[in-house]
């Protein structure tokens, strides 16, 4: 179908007209007629003489008919007629009256036929005009703007699926840019065939199932991401707990050191720690005094134990690390008073001997402890 879009608005412009085209239907008063004659005289100063103004009397009426370029006047008195004829002969070919001037003169009532020209710059078709095609009776609407024309029509579609087939119409919009009129557009008469996806895209009537699927997918994504975040946080907390626990165990291990384990193996369950004095020189002096005092006391006791063991049986030699119970029992077995002087002399000799032999025993024990 061929659609021709043209303008429905026309511009009526003022046109110049001659006296032969003026049709008067009423007569004016005397003063109005005089003013009109004065207006005509100003248009054709070179053609109308001053005798026309002086010779006209108060009884002159407005011209009532116009034909073939000459103007006739009605005279009710005996005024000279030659002046009127002179006026008509000089005006017939030179006077033109603009329609704008006639609109200002209230003495005339004219029925003119305006000149009609089509507009070529702006399409002014009514905003919502519905036209009916004469060929296929298709309905379309035309909307206009400043530079465009919008045509809306119905397009037939045929949708086919496995179980159903149906036809329907959807509105289509075509935009035509304004150019030299007339604008031409052909509405397609063929039927467009498609499946349900096309129907869903055009109207959205069959997208309910797809919308639910999309919502289910979104819900699944949200739930999965939440569960994943929770599991990740739990794993991170567990790993951090293990790392902190291992560090604490390492710190506790380093405080006790290697000697703590050796002391545990030789039945020294407790490790005493003493605070170091603030003055390092006092620490050195205390260490020397403690070492000398303990060495003298140990040498005295060891010599006495060795002497008593040799005097009792001569087979077992008591040692501070071995046989302490036998040493204590043997020590209280000697109670006679006459042996005290002898024992004192023997103790002096044995103390010197034990002082010589003790360092070797301590070195041996320390070596065994390090091996253990």
UniProtKB/Swiss-Prot annotation:
The modification Phosphoserine is found at residue 329. The chain crosses the membrane at residues 224-244. GO terms for cellular component: fungal-type vacuole; vacuolar membrane. This is Uncharacterized protein YDL211C. Present with 3360 molecules/cell in log phase SD medium. It is found in: Vacuole membrane. It is a single-pass membrane protein. Keywords: Membrane, Phosphoprotein, Transmembrane, Transmembrane helix, Vacuole.
